Amino acid sequence: MEEPNAAPLPSRLARLLSALFYGTCSFLIVLVNKALLTTYGFPSPIVLGIGQMATTIMILYVFKLNKIIHFPDFDKKIPGKLFPLPLLYVGNHISGLSSTSKLSLPMFTVLRKFTIPFTLLLEAIILGTQYSLNIILSVLAIVLGAFIAAGSDLTFNLEGYVFVFLNDIFTAANGVYTKQKMDPKELGKYGVLFYNACFMLIPTVIISVSTGDFQQATEFRHWKNVLFIIQFLLSCLLGFLLMYSTALCSYYNSALTTAVVGAIKNVSVAYIGMLVGGDYIFSLLNFIGLNICMAGGLRYSFLTLSSQLKPKQPVDEESIPLDLKS
């Protein structure tokens, strides 16, 4: 495998399209999962996650067999190369489920924004990435805007705070280590996705069975409903696309950019909620905070896309037509 001395930087278009791809997938899966879990009342979110992991494994394996993509065959070194991603995934999942049930939605949204500064900090520590003062101020503006938006709902729940901050740390660490592990000389982005899903599938099935989640899924009354099955399969496909687009966005940009795109998506959903749906309750403080959040996110996007000082990127030796065309 030959490596040139100077690895080409990804184009501005590649960085932009990968970020838009991630934002779109993240938005769509929220809509589909909301329909499944709320409208249909599907009682088993863990089973839904299992379906998404199984779909990821099947799609990537079929693509590998047909030589559309490449990633290393399994050997005894793979677990060491992937560590600690599976553990971070479990921690992220458990802390996320625990925190959502103990905090109000506005406060949960605020505290989840701390994923962004945690990501910035971990990128500096683990990857050695340095950011300008303007980038740091843009990140702080997003967090400040989130606090202002939820200013009327600053409830305190120590257990909830602990879980959500753990969730932030696990999410940030997962993004940064995913970025680190995607070196084409090692696992590459497809190898990271495939083996992470493989290692997590069996433990997740065990958790689902032991908690009664799997039994609830088998007893669900809508399995003969064609529309439900279509949406369930769509959620599984979108789960794969979300994992893929997250890796792609982190690969061409950074884990920090991926976190900021997620924040911009959340604010965009709030804006849409003002116009349609009827469940947005207007308050001046909330509206001001949302605008500060969006301004910080857009400022970050402008600075990132216009910057000429980009961190080194590994040569993408696994480029396939699926990249940026999904």
UniProtKB/Swiss-Prot annotation:
UniProt topological domain (Cytoplasmic) ranges: 37-41, 152-155, 211-225, 277-280
Pfam hit, one: TPT
Compartments where found: Golgi apparatus membrane
Catalyzed reactions per annotation: UMP(out) + UDP-N-acetyl-alpha-D-glucosamine(in) = UMP(in) + UDP-N-acetyl-alpha-D-glucosamine(out); UMP(out) + UDP-alpha-D-glucose(in) = UMP(in) + UDP-alpha-D-glucose(out)
Extracellular side: 1-15, 63-130, 177-189, 247-253, 304-326
Disulfide bonds: none
Keywords, comma-separated and alphabetical: Antiport, Golgi apparatus, Membrane, Sugar transport, Transmembrane, Transmembrane helix, Transport
GO molecular function, a single term: antiporter activity
Major localization class: Golgi
Keyword Transmembrane helix: yes
GO biological process: heparan sulfate proteoglycan biosynthetic process
Taxonomic superkingdom: Eukaryota
InterPro entries assigned: Sugar_P_trans_dom (IPR004853), TPT_transporter (IPR050186)
Membrane-topology annotation of the record: Multi-pass membrane protein
Chain segments annotated as transmembrane: 16-36, 42-62, 131-151, 156-176, 190-210, 226-246, 254-276, 281-303
Entry's Gene Ontology cellular component terms: Golgi apparatus; Golgi membrane
Chain's role: Nucleotide sugar antiporter transporting UDP-N-acetylglucosamine (UDP-GlcNAc) and UDP-glucose (UDP-Glc) from the cytosol into the lumen of the Golgi in exchange of UMP. By supplying UDP-N-acetylglucosamine, a donor substrate to heparan sulfate synthases, probably takes part in the synthesis of these glycoconjugates.
Homology family: Belongs to the TPT transporter family. SLC35D subfamily.
The protein's name: Nucleotide sugar transporter SLC35D2
Organism: Mus musculus (Mouse)
Encoding gene per record: Slc35d2
